[in-house]
A protein has these predicted regions:
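Short, basic/aromatic recognition patches
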Residues: 92-114
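TOPRIM fold recognition
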Residues: 6, 12, 18-22, 192-236
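Serine endopeptidase catalytic core focused on the charge-relay Asp
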Residues: 83-91, 121-124
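Short Gly/charged-rich anion-binding patches and loops
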Residues: 7, 81, 185, 189, ...
Length: 236
């Protein structure tokens, strides 16, 4: 089994549910403050905890809110701009060429003047594979620690939307093999090892009932293969 070493603050933040003072949505820094003061028998500043509620009025996803740069197999400048997002994952150019229609760089329009481009894998519904209902996003690795942002674009339909890379040249309903993964990176890595023209699907995290149901309804004759990790998310 993997062994991890924590300091007190790291342990509290990694395992907040072990502490009675924790409430869903509360700031982890606030939790650390409360727990440490209790351990030291210091008086605790009693105040109403700030719980961050999910946005219920979030704006629906709209691709027009982004500037898009697509990977063009005939233009090296576009390939060069995508390169940093694939380098650390070891995804080679041949694999990028194979999937080039299924990803692009997306820069959100912002009012503060800042500009951040993410590698975006478009999410769609199996029943409407040509419509984009969100983005699975990956950022560039930071120089200081090598870590990178990962998530989904605001307003994405995460409960039903899937990244669907159909390399067969046939309609989705006629597909015979569907390969499932937790991320588009994982799907591309599998193809790089075993380059088979199948349908590659990413759930962008823990799979949902809506994602699975939607795909099964559209591919009733297909065989499905799971390439999920063996961690908690992959078993979800």
């Amino acid at each position: 089994p993997e062994q991890k070493n924590y300091n007190v603050i790291g342990f509290i933040k990694e395992h907040p549910t072990l502490f009675d003072d924790y409430k869903p949505g509360m700031s982890l820094d606030r939790l650390v403050n409360i727990v440490c003061n209790r351990l030291l028998n210091n008086p605790i500043d009693v105040r109403e905890s700030r719980v961050v509620e999910p946005k219920r009025d979030a704006k629906p996803f709209n691709l027009s809110d982004y500037d898009i740069l697509r990977f063009n197999p005939r233009e090296k400048d576009t390939q060069r701009k995508h390169y940093p997002y694939f380098k650390e994952r070891g995804i080679n150019m041949r694999t990028q060429f194979a999937f080039h229609k299924q990803f692009f760089l997306a820069t959100r329009h912002r009012t503060d003047g800042l500009s951040f481009a993410n590698l975006a894998f478009p999410l769609s519904l199996p029943s409407k594979p040509d419509s984009i209902v969100g983005l699975e996003e990956r950022g560039r690795p930071r120089r200081e620690d090598g870590k990178a942002y990962k998530g989904k674009a605001e307003g994405s339909n995460s409960s039903e939307g899937l990244w669907i890379a159909n390399l067969t040249g046939k309609p989705l309903k006629d597909s015979t093999n569907i390969l499932w993964f937790e991320s588009a990176y994982d799907a591309m890595a599998e193809y790089q090892i075993n380059p088979v023209k199948s349908v590659y699907v990413s759930t962008g995290g823990t799979p949902t009932k809506g994602q699975i149901k939607g795909m099964l309804e559209e591919t009733r004759q297909a065989s499905h293969y799971l390439g999920f990790d063996k961690d908690e998310a992959g078993r979800g």
